[in-house]
Design a protein with these regions (language model features):
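Short, Lys/Arg-enriched N-terminal segments with co-localized hydrophobic residues
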Residues: 1-10
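Active-site loop-to-helix "anion-binding N-cap" substructures in soluble metabolic enzymes
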Residues: 11-264
């Protein structure tokens, strides 16, 4: 049982082409953290569309799908705007078939719906992050998720930098392989890092320096130039002694930013 990203050479990990899914229930972790308008209409479905090759391959192979994802960063247990129920209609349209929905990702309802799935059927679970155990990579929570299926597929490249229960914990309990999107992204990164064209420039953005420490430290040794963008650029500006006013800044990470600048 092995996860695609945690440990070892990613190029040697199994993909969905390496397993037989006929008649099996497959837990599929995807990244459907898509934007919505005020009426909760999806304004950009790119992340959903990019998973279709994986989902259709599994369905054509005779699998039943249990799809898991998160939306946003819920600060309360059940904020409606973060519910995956807002994805059901569009996902059904993309797949051309009915999509069942569970109002929780674990527990009696999810277990009953998952157990009753037949080959070719699809179940979408409620937001994983409604449970704090997801981000904590809680073993008991991961085991509950894994118990819904026979095998798991990780196609959520967008969250692969996080060791959460659904992507890092589940593989400890059931066999987990990479989906086509995950495989494509990892192969692209490996190819780029192994034999890059020069000059090699990396553009890294986001709000938090703390989320990118490992990436930046690793990239410093491989690239010619790193361009820092997004909110975390202000933390680096502060580290260089530049005025940033009231701009977003991780004050407790300024010393760390200084260390990274010195390393560069």
């Amino acid at each position: 049982r092995t996860s695609f990203l945690y440990g070892g050479d990613s190029m040697n990990k199994k993909t969905i082409k390496d397993i037989d899914v006929k008649g099996k229930k497959v837990f599929v972790r995807v990244d459907y953290n898509v934007p919505f308008d005020a009426e909760m209409n999806i304004t950009n479905d790119t992340r959903m569309v990019r998973t279709l090759p994986t989902l259709n391959y599994l369905l054509d192979g005779g699998a039943a799908l249990i799809i898991a994802c998160h939306i946003g960063r819920p600060t309360e247990a059940r904020e409606d705007k973060f519910s995956t129920k807002h994805l059901v209609k569009h996902l059904a349209e993309l797949l051309g078939r009915e999509v069942k929905w569970a109002s929780d990702c674990v527990g009696p309802e999810a277990e009953k719906l998952a157990a009753g799935l037949k080959p070719g059927e699809v179940l979408l679970l409620e937001n994983l992050r409604y449970h704090k155990e997801e981000k904590k990579n809680d073993p008991a929570f991961a085991k509950q998720l894994a118990s819904l299926a026979d095998v798991a597929v990780d196609d959520a490249f967008g969250v692969s930098h996080r060791a959460h229960a659904s992507n890092a914990g589940v593989p400890k309990y059931i066999e987990t392989v990479a989906g086509f999107l995950m495989e494509k992204e990892i192969n692209y990164i490996d190819k780029t890092l192994e034999n890059p064209q020069r000059p090699f420039v990396a553009i890294i953005g986001g709000a938090k320096v703390s989320d990118k420490i490992g990436v930046i430290s690793n990239m410093i040794e491989k690239v010619d130039t790193i361009i820092i963008g997004g909110g975390m650029a202000h933390t680096f500006d502060a580290a260089k002694g530049l005025p940033i006013g009231d701009s977003l800044c991780e004050r407790d990470k300024i010393d760390l930013a200084k260390e990274l600048l010195e390393k560069a």
